[in-house]
């Protein structure tokens, strides 16, 4: 049976191979940060995003889209990783610059056979342009998922700064640049 989570609620993860599905109704950038026991992200190389979509144990989409799929292999996570934060951000391309102007994002965690383990609809967002949707965390050797829904009005830079990343504005700018649509060819 699928657990329908509310903000702050957690649920055990019976599988180590997971697919995280995002339905946002508007193109969003989807990514993940890998953090230590305190949730601190030690450096920009611990962020999976469109410009660097693969890290040990996690693969994220290469471009913003309304429907996203992230692959996670908890068994392949380095031993120093205790938290995986799934993040969503509006890039400002295509109109919407705040989550309050779009439909509430829906996130589902599914096992290797596609069966949903847990779902979460991220409600209550308004002026925020970045949000930690879910957190996968390791406690006493077992992995769980927690519905977060923690939004950031200051966008991706504030989100990354909150996770202890040094120079978060630089990292956010690089991530958003990697997610920007390619410039249209010049007309001749």
Regions found by a protein language model. Give the residues of each.
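Intrinsic-disorder/low-complexity signal
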Residues: 1-188
């Amino acid at each position: 049976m699928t657990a329908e989570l509310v903000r702050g609620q957690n649920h055990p993860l019976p599988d180590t191979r997971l697919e995280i599905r995002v339905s946002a109704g508007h193109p969003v950038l989807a990514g993940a940060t890998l953090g230590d026991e305190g949730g601190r992200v030690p450096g920009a190389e611990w962020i999976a995003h469109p410009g660097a979509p693969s890290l040990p144990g996690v693969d994220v989409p290469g471009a913003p889209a309304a429907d996203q799929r992230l692959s996670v292999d908890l068994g392949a996570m380095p031993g120093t990783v205790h938290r995986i934060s799934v993040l969503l951000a509006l890039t400002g391309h295509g109109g919407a610059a705040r989550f309050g102007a779009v439909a509430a994002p829906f996130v589902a965690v599914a096992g290797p056979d596609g069966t949903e383990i847990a779902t979460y609809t991220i409600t209550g967002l308004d002026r925020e342009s970045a949000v930690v949707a879910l957190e996968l965390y390791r406690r006493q050797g077992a992995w769980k998922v927690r519905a977060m829904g923690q939004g950031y009005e200051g966008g991706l830079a504030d989100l990354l700064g909150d996770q202890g990343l040094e120079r978060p504005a630089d990292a956010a700018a690089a991530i958003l640049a990697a997610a920007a649509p390619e410039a249209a060819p010049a007309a001749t």
